[in-house]
Amino acid sequence: MKALQKWFGRRGALPLTAYLAALAVWVVLGAFHLGSDSLARAQGRLTEETMAATDWQLVGLTPNDDGTLTTVDGDPQMILENVGDRVVRTISYTAQFDGEARELCLYYTTKVGEDYSADRRVFPRSVGEGRYIYTLPRTSLAALRLDPCSPEENKTVTLTMSSITLNAADTLPHFWQYFVPSWYQAFCLVLYPALAAAAVSIAAAIVPGRKRN
């Protein structure tokens, strides 16, 4: 107890402790995610899988003889149900559009029969040459719905899409990337420990004052 009092009696000890605790939690979380993915690979649940676009259920899309897809309404969808025991971290494909694609997104559900919702969707990262990569959150998945484009009203879009790859090797994190935060995560690691330290400091200043009263 005296050692703790001595430590926290030092100037800047509280925020330093908060940052060290946040760093420790981040490292443990990264190690957990690394272990979880390694186990899924060993069990054969996290594997690279290549599928044709027509392996997905097409809604509002018509397949053509030349392998292209043409939209027939303003809300084209590609649905993959019964994701089951698969662990899907990323989805990637290459697409070219004859027409304005506008918004692209991927919806997911976590329970069978669950409705698709804007709260459960991700947007792609374009890496050039028409390639798009979607990174899914670490959660159980029941179904996926890819919205490959969003045509303007009364307009059609024809798209040429390569095969769709689940968990392409070059889209999954390397060992060290499990411990490197994104820009947003880095911002949170800077902000929240500081806020926590400030809150504890304010509470510590208020509680002794109440006792004296």
Region locations from a protein language model:
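Glycan-recognition and processing domains
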Residues: 5-85, 163-187
